[in-house]
């Protein structure tokens, strides 16, 4: 199975780039499942129902979020109502939405978990992502997930690496988002988990 993970899509120009190249890329590479971080898919920052709809129309199966997920009030009802639009699961307080979904593809099922880091992200209250990850992995297994993907939206490489090593062998892959900088450290960790920092 081929899973495509796309880091932060930024603004209308980022959405336009996705619209232009994603359908052809999915066809060329025979992509089975696509996760896009859309927390900045609206100009400025945040996500709106319109930007999410465009990302789904281009081929996203799940849209994840981050520290800007709650920036636009127009997103709140979408986060509550659309099962496949996520915000970080470990946001504290009464945040709209959820940070986990399970996609049944017929031949397999894919759980997507969205978590927020805490290092250098002190403007957003988030609980311990390690504890949240353990709880949601347990839920994913109980739900029958065959594949578990984590989008860890975090600033510090050290925090991303730490969670990657902690979850090695417990999940299929962890991809980092937030920094808007591609890294060249994609790897399979010792116990079989795919990992990349961005």
Where do the model's predicted regions map?
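Acidic, metal/ion-coordinating pockets
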Residues: 1-198
